[in-house]
Amino acid sequence: ALRQLGFDKVFDTDFAADLTIMEEGSELLDRLTRYLKGDKDVCLPILTSCCPAWVNFFEHQFPDMLDIPSTARSPQQMFGAIAKNYWAEKMNIPREDLIVVSIMPCLAKKYECAREEFATQGDPDVNYSLSTRELASLIKRANIDFNSLADEDFDHPLGESTGAGVIFGASGGVMEAALRT
């Protein structure tokens, strides 16, 4: 359906979720190692930072504790950075000519992709975030019949993802993915 709406490439964020959890896992191991070696200034616990609504709440309610959340990007932002940098270069497409649109269930993802730290020279890593409801509306307006669509695979810019990325969005999925990784 996305290709019928005009999207040239359709990627899944599972690979980016794998990268996010690897980064969060590495950061946790680093903090624990430093703590166990006697560094009492290490911030524990480490909290995931992939929910922009939670990050926004934390920034406003606990500005003195901003070193506790992980520094890892969310899968949306991780993939946007990969697409706009690595993949664009690989495809010989100028970064600013590539439009990255994410399809996400949470409206807070719109706020996340507009954050200044997720842009390079004013060009956002993710240009637009559509909610799943907005996507459903676009599909309906385009009169796309799901029952008549042929099965298609996602494009794979960097290879296959693991099962850890698949469970990332479920309740408890980040922790389970971290333990699997």
PLM feature segments, named:
Residues 1-181:
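Iron-sulfur-associated redox domains of electron-transfer enzymes in respiratory
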